[in-house]
Structure formats: structure tokens, C-alpha cells
Amino acid sequence: PVVTQYEVRPDARIKLSRIEGLADDLAMALAARSIRIEAPIPGRDVVGIEIPNHASEMVGFRSVFEDANMVDATSDLLFALGRDVSGKPYAVDLGRMPHLLIAGATGSGKSVCVNSIVTSILMRAKPTEVRFVLVDLKRVELAPYGRIPHLLTDVIMEAQEARAALAWAVGEMEERYKKLAKSTTRNIAAYNAGPDLDPTERMPYIVLMIDELADLMIQEGRKVEEPIVKLAQKARAVGIHLVLATQRPSVNVVTGLIKANVPSRIAFAMASNVDSRTVLDQPGAEDLIGRGDMLYQPADLPRPVRIQGVFVSDAEVKAVADFWREQEPEP
């Protein structure tokens, strides 16, 4: 939608490092803003050269959400991410990630991505299946989800309350582990599938989302880093998943401990290759075009995948949130 990828099979005698060094020369020859060279494309014997299109195409949320693969999937935590360079719909499962770090400069599409995650899950899961803890220190990004039945508490807008929510999540994690031990099951899926389980004892998944991790780290520092790392290390088996978003991916915010325990990452357009290395451990995000253009680094792939993120409009967010606010609470 945003770039066209050309596949080139170089002569066997040509070193890939020589091809990678031609990016600036190719960009100048094509009068392109930036060019990304993927050498080689994982699992293939070709080099990919990605050139920005003059007219970019928006990826609608509905077109990806209604794709057959997403409709047929059973996971409550699957969300629409966007389309890859070949135009194929791309959806990912937060349950398998199991935690996600999102970083990008202002206007790069980070906030839209956060909204697409929440909206996708709201359209797939009931409040008995997935609950949210939303931390929005900017006060405007996650406010539209106020009072939906999936929330465990109101949208949190103060750093001290966020610290308390993280401490609660660590306590909840430990309680859930005790329940797993008592039922001799290894994870939340096995526990919830137990034949003798009372429906009221079912454990919902919990998604703890922090929008503007930098503000929280600046105000609370180690007091929030510790519970975040604890949750990232252990919470997967009991169905608690973190989504951390930030505009300022400095090493003070995305610390080594957080990075080591959050292997799945999304980088939108960055100001410099230093920021790109902080998030992805490699350059590349500084050459992205913006407006939803991202590099997604899954935990199980050696290189990031370039994706054009879905666009979720404010009207779509409001429609989904209003629908859930109007539902009668389940007994």
C-alpha cells in the first residue's frame, strides 16, 4: 500500500554488503525519499528493494478485520495489524507475543495502532473473556473507552494510580499461579478448559496497556520498572499481557531489562537510527515514511516485517465503545 518491493536475484559472486551500500545511490537515482534494502528476504535467495509509492493507499480497519483468516481464528487476543508489502492482510495474536512494545515519533501512527489493538479485541471478546487496564497519561488517547464493561477500573490518567495498578497486576499474577498449582494445570487455557470448572471461576485474559511509558518512567522510575519486568517475565502463563507505547524510545525509558523481556516490538517512523536501534536492535525505522508505515519484529523471526498499519477512525472507535456501553451487564 505504501511501498513497492522489487525482488532482485544478484549474481552469486556479488556480496550482499555491496548491495546494501547502494541504498542512498538508488534513492537519489529514483528521486525517492528513502529506500530500504532487505538482503536477503528471509527464507528466499533474493534481495528485496522497497521503494515508496508516489500515492499511498490507506488500509481500512474493516478490510483486514473481515479477512477469512482473522474471522476463522479462535483467539480472543487476535488483532488486525495491517497489510504487508505484497498487500496481504496481517493479523497477530497478543497471546502468543506475549507482550508488545510500540514506539514511534509524533504523527507516525503509534496512537492509531494502539486503538486498533483495543478495538480489534473489543470486537472479538466479551467482558467475561478479556478485561483491560488502560493507562493513559496523555489523557486523550484512551479516554473514548471510558465506562466500557471490559475495564477493570476507570481509564487511569495519573502516574501514582498507574503504579498501584501495576502492583495489583503483580498480586493478581501470583494469585492466578496459586489457582493453576491447585488445579494442576500449566496455563490459563488449560485451566479454563477444565471439565469440572465452575463458569464463575473462569479466568479472563487481562491486557494492561500503557500509553506513554516515557511519562511514567520519568515520574516513577524504578518503582514501575520492577513490576513491569516481573509481569513481562512471568505473566504469560496466567493470561496477563502488556502493551507498552512510547514516543521517546531512549535507553532510560526502554531499559535493557524491559527490552530483554518484551521480545515483540513495533517501530513506526523514528527521528534517528539511534532510536531505531533502541527499539529493534538494528537501524531501519528512521527510513520509514510515517502515517502507519511500521517495522514489526515478532519474537520468532530474525528480521522485522514491513507493514502498513490499519487506520481506525474516531467514529469506528466510538461506535464500538458505545455498543459495549449500551449492553446489559452479564449476571
Regions found by a protein language model. Give the residues of each.
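N-terminal anchoring/assembly modules that precede and organize ATP-driven motor systems
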Residues: 1-7
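A short interface-forming secondary-structure element
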Residues: 7-16, 21
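Hydrophobic positions on the alpha1 helix immediately C-terminal to the Walker A/P-loop
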Residues: 113, 117
